[in-house]
Amino acid sequence: LSDSIKLLVPPGTSSIVDNIKSKTERWIRLNKENLDLSKIKSEKQMRVINFLLENIEAPALEVLDFTDVTRDVFVALQKKGVIDFFDLEVQRNPFFGKYVEKSEKLKLSDEQKNVLENIDIKRYDKYLIHGVTGSGKTEVYLQLIEEVLNTGKNALVLVPEISLTPQITDRFIARFGDVIAILHSRLSIGERYDEWRKIRDGKARIVIGARSAIFAPLDNIGALIIDEEHDSSYKSEMNPKYETKEVAEYLCKMYNCPLVFGSAT
């Protein structure tokens, strides 16, 4: 039972919860009530004040970069009571610093259109999309998910761990932006924890992950996609043993939504 429960709680909370700390960022806030411009003689201090008069508060590193001052200027302003420092929690972002150009949906072939039109997103049923790598299955997934999102529902996409490459995730990010959460073993425990919370808090509308992502706290599922459904990794041989497809069927019946399998064999 304890092994099963571990699948349903945030990564890291089972035994090392004290080791996972929230990530914070140092911010600066302007204290207008203590501001007396007649006492500010430093041009560098005025640069910081002018920036904060427009923004009130901002990340300290951003202020440093924009105003081109040193931390000594902050210290001087803090001593005068003009600014305060505070820490603001920020989520770890597995894609931080990575630019993915936004993409528009592609024109579907007649065969792809036929496949998409035959998937009823309003009720439970199982569908199999067959096609070798590069045949266009992913574009069908993307346009199916777009239809689901337009109804106000969410989508879950499972991919074998070995196939969960940056190329795959980049295609989804390019189409849907930051409403995506990723869950796989190559993320740090802190990144997985924050992605889990992003899903739980309703900030993610699409979850992409390996086998265990089937237990992500995603609500209001409108479509569940299992890519490369023939892959043996979807069956867990370790405790707790489970068959991902069986769990997926249960979820789709519960949410009355389609279960879509993709296969190249």
Regions found by a protein language model. Give the residues of each.
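Accessory, non-ATPase domains that flank or precede helicase/AAA+ motor cores in DNA-metabolism machines
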Residues: 1-263
